[in-house]
């Protein structure tokens, strides 16, 4: 949501989560968001046990702060867009980067069986965040970091022509990476 659901805010969302937990339908209350300010508000509220937020090696310093706050507050961090919606094409590098955080669980967004096989192979033979991998990360940051479309789709409902704005905005980057 575009806000942080809280008890008594009039939406009933947080109360519904509490009810679902009391009924045993869920074990934890978490929040998923793409907005940094909403994510930080959720962490500071003390109401949530997990945060699901876009996080990969293209993340900004402010996004890294979310990981630190989650660690400090013992809140689970689920990293969505761990491959940045297809912009990050080297799974070995992405895996090594995410593995440095003991409190981050990435969602890889596997689309092909071969990709799944790659990630499964890292369980027994995990890549290490060495100088070679760090160099790849730095190169990708120079090429890709900044104010690029992260593919969340929040802009889509606003287009009266129903243009897939997120895909159009990312096309030049995706073509360059292919």
Predicted regions and their residues:
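Glycine/proline-rich, positively charged
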Residues: 1-78, 83-86
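Structured C-terminal cap/extension of enzyme domains
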Residues: 65-79, 83-178
């Amino acid at each position: 949501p575009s806000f942080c659901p809280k008890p008594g805010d009039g939406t009933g969302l947080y109360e519904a989560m509490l009810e679902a937990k009391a009924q045993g339908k869920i074990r934890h209350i978490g929040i998923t968001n793409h907005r940094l300010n909403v994510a930080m508000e959720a962490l500071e509220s003390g109401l949530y046990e997990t945060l699901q937020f876009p996080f990969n090696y293209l993340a900004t310093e402010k996004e890294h702060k979310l990981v630190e706050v989650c660690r400090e507050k013992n809140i689970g961090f689920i990293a969505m867009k761990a491959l940045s919606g297809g912009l990050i094409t080297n799974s070995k590098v992405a895996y090594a980067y995410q593995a440095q955080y003991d409190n981050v669980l990435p969602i890889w967004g596997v689309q092909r069986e071969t990709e799944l096989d790659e990630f499964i192979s890292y369980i027994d033979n995990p890549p290490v965040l060495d100088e070679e991998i760090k160099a790849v990360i730095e190169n990708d940051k120079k090429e890709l970091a900044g104010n690029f479309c992260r593919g969340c789709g929040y802009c889509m409902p606003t287009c009266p022509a129903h243009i897939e704005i997120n895909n159009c905005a990312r096309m030049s980057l995706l073509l360059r990476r292919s």
